[in-house]
From Swiss-Prot:
Expressed by the venom gland. Residues 21-83 form the LCN-type CS-alpha/beta domain. This is Sodium channel neurotoxin MeuNaTxalpha-2. CDD domains: neurotoxins_LC_scorpion (cd23106). The lineage of its organism: Eukaryota, Metazoa, Ecdysozoa, Arthropoda, Chelicerata. The keyword NAD does not apply.
């Protein structure tokens, strides 16, 4: 029984866990993708590995793309200023 627990734990630690998050997608300067229509955001989000996306009107960062289930490797908007437009 103990061996089964140890093997299971070892396998769990060896396999990488890919998580996803819902967030505003951002470029390398911490600026959101400005939008007007949902198809644009859906396309940009899917291009970056998300399940879907839509244009969040009048949101925290104005009209910006919000992605659902975005991979960890893709940059998202973090607190702080947008460094250039």
């Amino acid at each position: 029984m103990n061996y089964l627990v140890m093997i299971s734990l070892a396998l769990l630690l060896m396999t990488g866990v890919e998580s996803a998050r819902d967030a505003y997608i951002a470029n390398d300067r911490n600026c959101v993708y400005t939008c007007a229509l949902n198809p644009y955001c859906d396309s940009e989000c899917k291009k970056n590995g998300a399940d879907s996306g839509y244009c969040q009107w009048f949101g925290r960062f104005g009209n910006a793309c919000w992605c659902k289930n975005l991979p960890d490797k893709v940059p998202i908007r973090i607190p702080g200023e947008c460094r250039g437009r």
